[in-house]
A protein has these predicted regions:
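N-terminal glycine-rich phosphate/pyrophosphate-binding loop and immediately adjacent elements
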Residues: 66, 73, 77-248
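Active-site/ligand-binding neighborhood in enzyme catalytic cores
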Residues: 233-374, 385
Length: 617
């Protein structure tokens, strides 16, 4: 029986997130400039019932968050004569890099006034929290940044910040039940598509069954079946006699698909199995992923280890340092630390279920004001180079604020349009970073019995719109408990990355951005329902009956630019475009993961530290 799926959409995002949420503040911070010009200061305090994490439908870069910046790119200008407020520091971007910058700056200047501006209706940037209600139960998912990946690789300041915020990494060893699915006999499975394999077939037990048994069930030709078993079991060195360093140089510029085709010499069907394997990690197909990189991934990709000794991998530390909402909890801990009254509690456990009071974020008596729904459109050094004037748009109204210093913790590609006075060389360095589009769709199902019956916790699709359907990480922290048994609700993670067979390099990401912005919620929804039915229908799953809600986290500007693909250029350190782009520009400093060309939380933190040190010395 078909039922309506919850999907309160942000089609008119500014009406929902701004028009009904802005309430008058009880008091206001008046700049001295207001006495001069006699203008009335706008009020930005949000209502008590404002709560974006509970919204379903299109999230991520939701409608209302991107349109004004796109107008700026097309040449639109907003002229505001009067400076409404003054701050010691203004930060553009309320993601982890921007919030970390505020946190570190306050260590040196605890009494300074800080304003953080963000174009989204929630803070955290790509660290997005998704909440679902199922009766009295709450299920939480991550809509973006997933985990503290490899905490030992974090800069010292990041590990220190975690400690100060109360993040005790050792607790994850108990909180993350690593064997929950495996002890039920659940593992990895593959849905083979008809176009490439002649029939649509879901084969379970990848890595659990013998390779011979798995291959026997897979819809492969005799030659492909033989080659599949060989690539999984052979201990051949496909570059025998070549020195190790030379092997590394060769394979660093050899895509994994080419390695399978030219060195292992497998049937094309075997290549097709793995062509999209790491799509959610690298966001390109395996023709563009260096063979050296698949060893780091540690994701069941065969054939390399006996040719090239493994140097490092994600498995050097377990992948367990995960809050139920991903790294959104880091952003929430930062906000709780800096804005009194924004959250209750004091620990890493209670932050998971604490409800943010958004009415506290932008009060006039705050030392730090976090202003959402505010798209910055112009940033300029001014006042005889002693300050920075910033124009931003909120709803249909433009405002101007002044800061002694400014940190841009936004997308690199936006900065040349925000700061047209920059040199062409610096603009080119910033524009080099083409962010990578992707979509994280979260599906709340009322039970996961079909997954359990099929003994799969992760479904990989060789074809199809979504690359995977994966059960939530089994994490229990504080009062939040993971789904205990298959008859309980579960959040399923699905990932879509636009893929173009005839486009490579950054141009595929530009085209992908256009594509996902043009895709409706209904299309994202239908693909999710069709693919879950395809994989789980044989075990009794019915999408119309079993899906409770869908949240689509659409990120047209997702991962930071990756230079580590086979076509990546080799630069001297000082010639790297992102290094040139992040140089201090008067009183304007740059902090974001783009500035390190690395889509990681540790990069976001490191670049925040660098930008703050430029200010504090």
């Amino acid at each position: 029986m078909k039922k309506n799926i919850t999907r309160r959409d942000f089609i008119n995002g500014t009406q929902v997130a701004i028009g009904t949420a802005v309430a008058a503040a009880s008091t206001t911070f008046i700049s001295p400039w207001m006495d001069v010009f006699g203008a009335e200061l706008a009020n930005f305090t949000l209502n008590n019932d404002y709560y974006p994490p509970a919204e379903n439908g299109l999230r991520g870069s939701h409608d209302g968050s991107w349109e004004n910046m796109h107008l700026r790119v097309m040449g639109e200008e907003w002229v505001v004569d009067n400076v409404e407020e003054e701050y010691d520091l203004i930060i553009v971007g309320g993601g982890i890099s921007g919030l970390t910058a505020a946190y570190l700056y306050r260590k040196t200047y605890p009494d300074h006034k800080i304003l953080v501006l963000d174009n989204h209706d929630d803070f955290g940037g790509h660290a997005k929290r998704n909440e679902f209600r199922h009766g009295d139960d709450i299920r939480i998912g991550y809509g973006g940044t997933e985990a503290i990946d490899g905490p030992s690789t974090y800069p010292a300041i990041g590990r220190q910040m975690f400690e100060e915020l109360g993040i005790e990494l050792d607790q994850f060893y108990e909180a993350f039940e690593q064997d929950l699915y495996s002890k039920r006999g659940m593992g990895f499975s593959i849905v083979f598509d008809e176009e490439q394999f002649g029939e649509t077939k879901h084969v379970t037990g990848y890595g659990q069954k013998s390779w011979e048994d798995f291959a026997a069930e897979a819809p492969l030709s005799d030659k492909a079946r033989e080659d599949f078993i060989r690539v999984q079991t052979a201990e051949d060195d496909y570059l025998e006699g070549t020195p190790t360093e030379e092997k590394f140089r060769i394979l660093q510029k050899t895509g994994y698909s080419s390695f399978l085709r030219d060195y292992v010499q497998v049937d094309e069907q075997v290549i097709n199995i793995y062509q999209n394997w790491g799509m959610s990690f690298w966001t390109v197909d395996m023709e563009e992923v260096p063979t050296t990189s698949v060893q780091y991934y540690d994701g069941g990709i065969p054939g390399v280890d006996h040719t090239l000794p493994k140097r490092a991998g994600r498995g050097d530390e377990p992948y367990i340092f995960h809050f139920p909402d991903g790294n959104a909890s880091i952003a929430r801990l930062l906000v709780r630390n800096m804005i009194p009254g924004s959250f209750s509690g004091s620990t890493m456990e209670d932050i998971v279920t604490a409800k943010a009071d958004y009415s506290m974020l932008d009060r006039s008596d705050n030392q730090l004001n976090l202003r959402l729904n505010s798209t910055v459109v112009h940033v300029v050094n001014t006042n005889q180079s002693a300050a920075v004037d910033i124009t931003y748009v909120r709803g249909e109204t433009a405002h101007k604020v002044r800061g002694k210093k400014c940190i841009l913790a936004c997308y690199n590609s936006a900065i040349p349009y925000l700061c047209p006075e920059m040199s062409e060389e610096q603009k080119a360095g910033l524009a080099h970073c083409v962010k990578i589009p992707l979509v994280y769709t979260k599906v709340l199902i009322n039970n996961w019995e079909a997954f359990d019956k099929l003994k799969t916790s992760f479904v990989y699709y060789t074809g199809g719109f979504y690359k995977q359907a994966e059960l939530a990480y089994p994490v229990s922290l504080g009062e939040y408990k993971r789904s205990q048994t298959p008859d309980q609700p579960m959040v399923v993670h699905m990932c879509h990355v636009p893929l173009f067979k005839d486009i490579t390099g950054p141009e595929q990401w530009r085209e992908g951005r256009r594509q996902i912005l043009a895709t409706t919620f209904e299309e994202f929804e239908q693909h999710a329902k069709d693919q879950l039915n395809q994989a789980l229908g044989e075990a009794g799953f019915d999408a119309d009956r079993d899906i409770e809600a869908i949240t689509v986290n659409r990120w047209p500007h997702g991962y930071a630019y990756s230079n580590g693909l086979v076509w990546g250029e080799d630069f001297a350190e000082e010639d790297k475009p992102w290094v040139i782009g992040r140089k201090q520009f008067g009183n304007i400093h740059i902090a974001n993961s783009d500035a390190a060309s690395s889509a990681t939380t540790q990069a976001a933190i490191a670049m925040a530290e660098r930008a703050v040190k430029e200010i504090t010395g």
